[in-house]
């Protein structure tokens, strides 16, 4: 290809030289102006030509021929800056119009009517339905008039109240009115079908509230109030193991609050004690007794009060007949000698007590016992909450008797 280029260039130059020779021969007797013009053409022949006789290798000649006629590439930075540059006339963003606040003179409350298109609706829905969001914000969802009143009575802070019908709001107007003035509770009216979708209950009560979880300060205040009324917590910690049913866990917490126990420990693998069904099963017990949830067996020893760590007794309530045969068990009525603090481990009806619980029992040596409730022939077990009620009040009776003997 390079030879062809040089060949064509040489042929063109030869033709131009021949033309000049003809001009010289014909102009020997011609006028002076024509001869000068021919000489100027000869002098500038290669200077004005588009062809250049430049040293060039084959690779460079092929590259020039391949990319001849193409547009030069635009650097990436210039393209990016051009594409990412702001438009000359950006469209202004229209901020959503906030819903008007409705002042109800009859209830003496202020609320906002939410629609499905309101951005706040999706935010509230995420908070209600997402356990991860609730755990991060340490919030709980409370449904129903009685449970909301119980939470307010125990000093919990109500962030949001949702209602669908005005007559339902009227049932709690006094307590909610105080909360709105003191803590700035926000009240929203939503359609009944939306509230039914958000609720985890089959029959929604029409009232749903978002509360902050009980704080240590609030529990200490409730404890001081119980002591003032003559109700001192007993040195008993109930440890829930493999409790998978929310209603059963709620009933267990309710019994512990009724005794009352020092605290309730919910081990890893149990259901959520702050789930809506567990709260309804607890009937407000979660607001009155300290609860430590999602505790591993390695962390269980840290829940024992430091002042009673040297004299802590551990009891396992075993309902499985086969496990009772493999371990030395005693009748719960034959328990003798309780410690400065006592751990009662109770398992679920389906899975029973785990092997981790027995390994923890072996750590305390002679201060650990496996107990059972004798039942009639043909009856395999009791409901876990019913069994716990029998055991706790028997331990309470023995603690009272033990204290009276020391006096």
UniProtKB/Swiss-Prot annotation:
Gene Ontology BP terms: rRNA processing
Keyword Disulfide bond: no
SMART domains in alphabetical order: SpoU_sub_bind (SM00967)
Transit peptide feature, positions: 1-25
Binding positions for S-adenosyl-L-methionine per the UniProt entry: 347, 373, 382
Molecular function terms from GO: RNA binding; rRNA (guanosine-2'-O-)-methyltransferase activity; rRNA (uridine-2'-O-)-methyltransferase activity
Recorded superkingdom: Eukaryota
Compartments, as annotated in UniProt: Mitochondrion
GO CC terms, sorted: mitochondrial matrix
EC number: 2.1.1.-
InterPro entries: Alpha/beta_knot_MTases, MRM3-like_sub_bind, Ribosomal_eL30-like_sf, rRNA_Methyltransferase, SpoU_MeTrfase, SpoU_subst-bd, tRNA_m1G_MTases_N
Keywords linked to the UniProt accession: Methyltransferase, Mitochondrion, rRNA processing, S-adenosyl-L-methionine, Transferase, Transit peptide
Catalytic activity: a uridine in rRNA + S-adenosyl-L-methionine = a 2'-O-methyluridine in rRNA + S-adenosyl-L-homocysteine + H(+)
UniProt similarity note: Belongs to the class IV-like SAM-binding methyltransferase superfamily. RNA methyltransferase TrmH family.
Function: S-adenosyl-L-methionine-dependent 2'-O-ribose methyltransferase that catalyzes the formation of 2'-O-methylguanosine at position 1580 (Gm1580) in the mitochondrial large subunit ribosomal RNA (mtLSU rRNA), a conserved modification in the peptidyl transferase domain of the mtLSU rRNA. Also required for formation of 2'-O-methyluridine at position 1579 (Um1579) mediated by MRM2.
Name listed for the protein in its UniProt record: rRNA methyltransferase 3, mitochondrial
Organism annotation: Drosophila melanogaster
């Amino acid at each position: 290809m390079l030879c062809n280029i040089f060949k064509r260039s040489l042929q063109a130059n030869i033709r131009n030289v021949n033309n000049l020779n003809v001009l010289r021969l014909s102009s020997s007797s011609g006028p002076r102006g024509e001869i000068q013009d021919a000489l100027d053409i000869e002098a500038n022949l290669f200077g004005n030509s588009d062809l250049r006789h430049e040293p060039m290798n084959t690779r460079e000649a092929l590259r020039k021929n391949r990319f001849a006629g193409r547009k030069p590439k635009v650097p990436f930075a210039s393209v990016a800056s051009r594409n990412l540059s702001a438009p000359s006339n950006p469209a202004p963003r229209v901020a959503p119009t906030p819903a008007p606040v409705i002042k109800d003179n009859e209830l003496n409350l202020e609320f906002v009517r939410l629609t499905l298109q309101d951005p706040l609706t999706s935010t509230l829905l995420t908070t209600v339905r997402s356990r991860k969001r609730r755990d991060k914000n340490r919030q709980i969802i409370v449904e129903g008039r009685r449970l909301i009143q119980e939470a307010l009575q125990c000093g919990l802070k109500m962030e949001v109240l949702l209602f669908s019908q005005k007559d339902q709001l009227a049932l709690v107007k006094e307590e909610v009115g105080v909360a709105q003035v003191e803590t700035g509770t926000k009240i929203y009216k939503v359609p009944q079908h939306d509230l039914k979708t958000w609720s985890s209950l089959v029959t929604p009560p029409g009232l749903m509230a978002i509360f902050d979880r009980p704080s240590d300060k609030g529990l200490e205040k409730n404890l001081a109030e119980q002591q003032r009324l003559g109700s001192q917590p007993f040195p008993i910690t109930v440890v829930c193991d493999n409790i998978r049913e929310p209603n059963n866990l709620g009933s267990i917490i309710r019994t512990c609050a009724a005794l009352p126990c020092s605290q309730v420990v919910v081990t890893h693998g149990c259901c959520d004690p702050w789930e809506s069904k567990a709260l309804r099963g607890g009937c407000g017990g979660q607001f009155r007794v300290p609860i430590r949830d999602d505790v591993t067996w390695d962390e269980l020893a840290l829940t024992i009060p430091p002042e009673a760590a040297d004299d802590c007794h551990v009891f396992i309530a075993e309902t499985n007949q086969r496990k009772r045969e493999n371990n030395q068990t005693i009748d719960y009525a034959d328990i003798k000698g309780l410690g400065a603090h006592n751990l009662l481990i109770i398992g679920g009806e389906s899975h029973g007590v785990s092997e981790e619980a027995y390994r923890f029992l072996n750590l305390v040596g002679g201060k650990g016992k496996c107990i059972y409730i004798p039942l009639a022939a043909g009856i395999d077990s009791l409901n876990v909450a019913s069994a716990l009620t029998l055991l706790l009040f028997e331990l309470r009776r023995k603690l009272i008797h033990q204290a009276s003997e020391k006096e």
